[in-house]
Amino acid sequence: MWYNALYFVAELLGKNELKDLADKAGVSFIDTFLNEHGYLLDYVDGHMMDWSVRPNMIFAAAFDYSPLNTRQKKGIVDICSKELLTPKGLRSLSPKSGGYNPNYVGPQHQRDYAYHQGTAWPWLAGFYFEAYLKIYKMSALGFIERHLIGFEEEMTSHCIGSIPEVFDGNPPFRGRGAVSFAMNVAEILRTLNLLSKYNY
């Protein structure tokens, strides 16, 4: 996000020194977070590295300004497709990672744990679809449309015309949490707007 913000402001103000700063940040970002398996570490703290596959990395592939090249972005999109994508959004943690808990049920502390350990978040799908479009262009349109259809049934199930906060990370992907969540609706609408730019 810092890299994207620096480049955005540099373009806005015409400040090349900000671009130079962004380029330095980009090199540091890649050296620190890109691992040999082609995806981004979730966090690095000194010598401690979290190899969990989480959706935070999708932002680096989706933003207009990114230190990643196309091949690196594709690696991120591909691992998100394989391990995080559900019909209801991106899981907050891969099922292959330790501590995976896909079910947002039980007392508050249990739900709070599951929230970041495997539930599917619809709003993250917007950034995933944006990154997918940037990699696969026109061939992505049908794939994205099929995924969006999965949200239509939700708009009559919980709160009419809206989408729940989260979904269980495993089938049958039950809607949980708040029955209406503005970020989810906003990202679906933003995705439709992105598709419209392809005259779709």
Spans of features found by a protein language model:
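Catalytic cores of carbohydrate-active enzymes
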Residues: M1-S97, N101-N103, R146, E153-V185
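Short glycine/serine- and small hydrophobic-enriched flexible loop segments
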Residues: N4-E11, A62-Y65, F127-K134, R190-L194
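Short, flexible coil/linker elements and helix-boundary hinge sites characteristic
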Residues: G14-E17, K137, N193, N199
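C-terminal substrate/ligand-recognition segments
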Residues: G99-A140, L189-N193
